[in-house]
Regions:
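Polyanion-binding interface signature
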Residues: 1-83
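Contiguous, amphipathic alpha-helical segments that mediate oligomerization or scaffolding
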Residues: 1-11, 94-95, 99-113
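Exposed alpha-helical structural elements
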Residues: 49-53, 92, 103
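Accessory terminal regions of nucleic-acid processing enzymes
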Residues: 72-95, 102, 110-113
Length: 113
């Protein structure tokens, strides 16, 4: 993970045109909100979307933006830069992300996306 960037993702590709992504994004005025989400893109020209049953599996919140399914992580909402640095340095944040990826992956590996 490149901590100098606002966003990082893991892509599962069937082919060049069909991709399912698990992503993490820091947002907010000072990038103090961390969100995780999933999205499915079936064409380079199409609007990213997530199948309804995928959204139901991962989150109870749906929006119409770039990440139709996402979750704010309460523990990491409005955290201070110093707290963020500590979570990164201790490895707690990367462990949380690894657990989240495993959680998502376990639920998508048998789905026909």
């Amino acid at each position: 993970i490149d901590w100098t960037k606002q966003y990082t993702k893991i892509s599962f590709r069937k082919n060049e045109w069909d991709t399912f992504e698990i992503g993490f994004n820091f947002e907010g005025k000072n990038l103090t909100h961390l969100i995780s989400g999933v999205r499915h893109i079936d064409s380079l020209n199409s609007k990213p979307d997530v199948h309804k049953h995928i959204v139901e599996i991962f989150t109870d919140h749906k929006q119409s933006g770039w990440w139709p399914a996402y979750q704010y992580i309460p523990k990491y909402k409005n955290w201070l830069a110093l707290e963020m640095q500590e979570y990164i340095e201790t490895g707690e944040l990367i462990r949380w992300m690894e657990n989240k990826v495993n959680y998502y992956y376990d639920r998508i590996e048998n789905l026909n996306l």
